[in-house]
C-alpha cells in the first residue's frame, strides 16, 4: 500500500505508476511511502 502526504503527491505517484514506474521508484519520486500494513499514518492518508 502506498501512503502520500498530499493529493499532489498522490497524483504524481499514480501518474508515475501508470507510466510503468515501479512502486519504490514512484514513491521516491513523489514523496510517498510504501507500507506493508493496510492503514496509513496520520497525515499520510492521500
Swiss-Prot record:
Keyword Transmembrane belongs to the record: no
GO-annotated biological processes: defense response
Cystine residue pairs: 3-40, 4-32, 16-26
Principal place of residence: secreted
A family per Pfam: Thionin
Record InterPro entries: Thionin, Thionin-like_sf
Record localization: Secreted
Molecular functions per Gene Ontology: toxin activity
GO annotations of cellular component type: extracellular region
Keywords, ordered alphabetically: Disulfide bond, Plant defense, Secreted, Toxin
Modified residues (Blocked carboxyl end (His)): 46
General function of this protein: Thionins are small plant proteins which are toxic to animal cells. They seem to exert their toxic effect at the level of the cell membrane. Their precise function is not known.
Family: Belongs to the plant thionin (TC 1.C.44) family.
Protein name: Phoratoxin
Species of provenance: Phoradendron leucarpum subsp. tomentosum (California mistletoe)
